[in-house]
């Protein structure tokens, strides 16, 4: 491992006291930030940050008022004196609360009806609440005859009524939703009585409940995750050290991550609530790699410090690369335009960076001060029967996979293609209410309102005429009426209210008989007169002051952005075909969320592509091969595509929660791929045979892959206990991805690795290549130091003790040797057995090259005169060099041809001397 990085990774091993002090200091600083952590229960994070529709929405609400409403449902016999008194008192109480801009109920909204002296425009209760049955019956008749009331404020059967409180929270007041919804609860509690069912539902209560659920998830998910990982670690390591160390760094990583969220003012919301559990699980996985390598070194007979040093060196590179790819992968989310995903991208990237520091600081520190486990100390140097049997089964399985690589690859390809169809069928659906389970009080109340009245949700449809008094034009009025009639025919839309309802009701009162249809006057002057008769406070929500624009309030029970988007498309088609001379545009928080959902559908693909590109570039740089970089993506891409196929098959929507499954999955599963490929590179350098290297890699990595994958699946499974439906979906999909990734790593990776030769940048940096050797070595003539390192890593570096033979006469050996350091002597023996020195080979010198191109039987011996390092190359190694680094290989082949030419010339000269009887020595 390169000097600086190696020193950083091993710093805590050599400086345990300083490392412990630093760890405690960082943990303390993180803990001190926790009180500053913000809980964001709003739905603004679900919207696009730079959406032009957001500016339009602000303009609409400034003109017609807020669409943020709280409903107080009253169920029972509404047209009785006690019930009407309750409705009146609740209306008055809500109107007195801070932030309330308007209250609509049967007690506050004007009713238009005929009177003995002509026309009456007043609230139903303006003369007080009648106590006699006849008076109550007349009140009921008036209310149920008014289209503004029926379905909007009172049910058609008179058994339910609702009080609508529209709110506009003070700017910057983050406690409004909690405070206001609790104040409404107090009002409801005061008015509760036998015979009436009273409850509230609406934006403030929903947002308050979100905040409460976020806090509950923090209280439940993290302990459940710790308990799950504790059980998994006990099964896997069976030592206190193997249990405590990963949990310690995992919990510390979660603490540091949350502390960083608080420090950078990243709130805890319905999406970022999963970050602590995520980093806890990921931190556990990285710790397991180091501890597994450490225990393997102890079993091999190394003492504590050498074992720990080797383990950190072995696992450090994959952990560093995995962290870089994972952080950059999650970092792609910050380029999203959805606030909640941007916040998750920052939070996850910061937390995973903290996890890297905590792992490489905490794990070596704990292992350094922890006594060597007795079980490992006693079994040092011994191979267990069970372990040997498992290795044999792994090798047989790997052999089977390599022999049947084509049908296995075809099976994975077929599943992937089928899953692409499933991905295509995934629907985009995000909605704040859909975050709650069907059994939750929020969903139950919403459904009750939907069944009883016109729906618990609302949005606006604004008709802009572009001219003053344009709304007073009867033609415009009739077009608005047509839009309302169409909307009420769309499934899920229960009621629309506009200025047309007021005008037509007033016109009917003047001109029509009871029961006659309501129509808009044909005369603009009559329409204008009707508008003047109305109370501006009552109609301000439906028409602006210059009568330039009209607002249609749409009450609906549409669930999620999918249904809303379909309804809006139908509205657009109707407007395009039937409406002329005006502009029609929808507005509302639900509309903004819907636009974000459409954006998210595209962003899920682009974010996935960006993540793949980042990982591919890093791996291509690490293994110095675009081919290797692309191959490394396949075991990670396949599980993600399969997960989207499952989403399509099970009709799981793409929401703000599940949209992250691709980024999370590929960010985590890449860990096993990096460990696999780095191990394969090292095994290939040792064995020089792809098949053998693949088998040894799988023997080494099988346990960590299976163990970590199952642990990750269990850890993500804990998130299924979340109170939020998208988090539950994310958990279940992540469990599937972890298992699919495990199968991909165990089955696909061996096939892919066997098809390529891997050399890592880290390996090249490890090779020492001084300028003197480059100058003296004829095989390396014209090569840069970097290219020379590639050549060295293509072959095998062999260390030889003094007196050790590299070649013996008569051996079958087709390798070329280059002395890297030390000295070799090439010797022969005459007929009398007397040894003769044929040549002394110094660093940079080459011997054995003719055996590589000839029949391979050696005619001389080569022995080390001192401690010597030699580089061994055969034709297979040169062929690998040609495929991986063709320009470097061309220089090596040129140099080899030059060396062989010189050897041929030397041999010819020597033969001439011998034939002439000269005794000139051979060199």
What are these regions (language model features)?
Residues 62, 129-239, 478-481, 526-612:
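Extracytoplasmic
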């Amino acid at each position: 491992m390169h000097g600086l990085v190696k020193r950083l990774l091993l710093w805590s091993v050599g400086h345990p006291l300083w490392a412990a002090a630093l760890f405690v200091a960082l943990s303390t600083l993180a803990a001190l930030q926790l009180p500053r952590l913000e809980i964001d229960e709003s739905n603004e994070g679900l919207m696009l940050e730079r959406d032009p529709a957001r500016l339009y929405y602000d303009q609409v609400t400034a003109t017609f008022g807020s669409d943020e409403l709280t409903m107080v449902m009253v169920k029972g016999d509404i047209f009785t004196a006690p019930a009407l008194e309750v409705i009146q008192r609740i209306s008055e109480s809500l109107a007195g609360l801070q932030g309330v801009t308007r209250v609509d109920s049967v007690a506050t909204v004007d009713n238009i009806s005929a009177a003995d002296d002509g026309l009456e425009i007043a609230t139903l209760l303006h003369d007080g609440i009648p106590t006699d049955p006849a008076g109550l019956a007349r009140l009921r008749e008036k209310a149920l005859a008014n289209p503004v009331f029926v379905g909007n404020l009172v049910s058609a059967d008179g058994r339910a009524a609702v009080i609508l409180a529209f709110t506009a929270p003070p700017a910057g007041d983050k406690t409004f939703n909690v405070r206001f919804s609790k104040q409404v609860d107090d009002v409801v509690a005061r008015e509760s009585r036998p015979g009436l069912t009273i409850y509230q539902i609406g934006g403030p209560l929903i947002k308050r409940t979100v905040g409460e659920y976020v806090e509950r998830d923090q209280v439940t998910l993290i302990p459940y995750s710790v308990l799950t990982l504790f059980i998994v670690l006990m099964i896997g390591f069976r030592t206190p050290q193997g249990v405590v160390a990963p949990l310690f760094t995992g919990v510390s990583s979660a603490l540091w991550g949350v502390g960083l969220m608080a420090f950078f003012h990243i709130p805890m919301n319905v999406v970022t609530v999963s970050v602590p559990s995520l980093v806890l699980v990921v931190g556990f996985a990285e710790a397991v790699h180091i501890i597994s390598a450490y225990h393997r070194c102890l079993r091999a007979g190394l003492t504590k410090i050498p074992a720990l040093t080797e383990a950190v060196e072995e696992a450090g590179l994959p952990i560093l690369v995995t962290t870089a790819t994972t952080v950059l992968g999650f970092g792609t989310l910050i380029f999203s335009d959805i606030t909640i995903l941007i916040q998750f991208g920052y939070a996850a990237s910061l937390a995973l960076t903290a996890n890297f520091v905590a792992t490489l600081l905490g794990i070596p520190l704990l292992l350094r001060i922890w006594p060597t486990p007795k079980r490992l100390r006693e079994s040092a140097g011994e191979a267990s029967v069970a372990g040997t049997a498992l290795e044999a089964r792994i090798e047989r399985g790997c052999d089977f996979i390599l022999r049947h690589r084509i049908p296995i690859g075809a099976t994975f390809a077929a599943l992937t293609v089928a899953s692409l169809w499933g991905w295509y069928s995934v629907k985009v659906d995000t909605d704040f209410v859909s975050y709650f389970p069907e059994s939750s009080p929020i969903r139950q109340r919403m459904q009750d309102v939907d069944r009883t009245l016109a729906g618990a949700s609302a949005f606006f449809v604004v008709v802009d005429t572009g001219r003053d008094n344009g709304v007073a034009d009867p033609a415009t009025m009739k077009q608005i009426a047509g839009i309302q009639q169409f909307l009420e025919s769309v499934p899920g839309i229960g009621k629309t209210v506009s200025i047309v309802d007021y005008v037509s009701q007033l016109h009917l009162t003047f001109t029509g008989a009871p029961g006659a249809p309501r129509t808009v006057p044909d005369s603009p002057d009559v329409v204008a007169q009707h508008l003047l008769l109305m109370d501006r406070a009552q109609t301000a929500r439906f028409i602006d002051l210059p009568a330039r624009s009209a607002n249609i309030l749409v009450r609906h029970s549409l669930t999620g952005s999918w249904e809303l988007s379909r309804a809006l498309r139908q509205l657009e088609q109707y407007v395009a075909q039937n409406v002329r001379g005006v502009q029609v545009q929808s507005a509302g928080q639900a509309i903004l969320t819907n636009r974000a959902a459409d954006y998210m559908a595209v962003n899920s693909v682009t974010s996935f592509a960006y993540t793949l590109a980042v990982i591919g570039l890093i791996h291509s740089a690490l293994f110095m091969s675009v081919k290797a970089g692309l191959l490394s993506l396949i075991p990670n891409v396949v599980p993600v595509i399969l997960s989207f196929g499952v989403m399509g098959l099970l009709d799981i929507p793409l929401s703000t929660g599940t949209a992250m499954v691709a980024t999370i999955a590929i960010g985590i599963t890449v860990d096993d791929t990096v460990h696999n490929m780095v191990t394969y590179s090292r095994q290939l350098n040792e064995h020089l045979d792809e098949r053998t290297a693949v088998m040894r890699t799988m023997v080494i990595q099988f346990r960590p892959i299976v163990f970590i994958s199952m642990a990750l699946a269990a850890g993500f499974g804990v998130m299924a206990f979340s109170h939020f439906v998208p988090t539950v979906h994310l958990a279940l999909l992540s469990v599937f991805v972890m298992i699919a990734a495990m199968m991909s790593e165990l089955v696909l990776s061996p096939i892919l690795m066997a098809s390529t030769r891997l050399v890592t940048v880290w390996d090249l940096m490890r090779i020492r290549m001084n300028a003197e050797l480059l100058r003296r070595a004829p095989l390396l003539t014209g090569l840069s130091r970097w290219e020379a390192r590639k050549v060295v890593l293509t072959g095998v570096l062999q260390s030889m003790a003094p007196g050790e033979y590299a070649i013996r006469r008569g051996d079958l050996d087709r390798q070329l040797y280059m002395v890297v350091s030390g000295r070799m002597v090439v010797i022969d023996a005459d007929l009398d057995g007397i040894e003769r020195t044929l040549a002394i080979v110094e660093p940079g010198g080459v011997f054995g090259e003719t055996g590589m191109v000839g029949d391979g039987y050696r005619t001389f011996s080569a022995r080390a005169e001192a401690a010597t390092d030699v580089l061994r190359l055969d034709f297979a190694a040169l062929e690998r060099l040609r495929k991986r680094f063709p320009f470097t290989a061309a220089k090596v082949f040129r140099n080899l041809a030059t060396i062989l030419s010189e050897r041929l010339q030397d041999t010819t000269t020597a033969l001439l001397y011998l034939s002439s009887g000269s005794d000139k020595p051979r060199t």
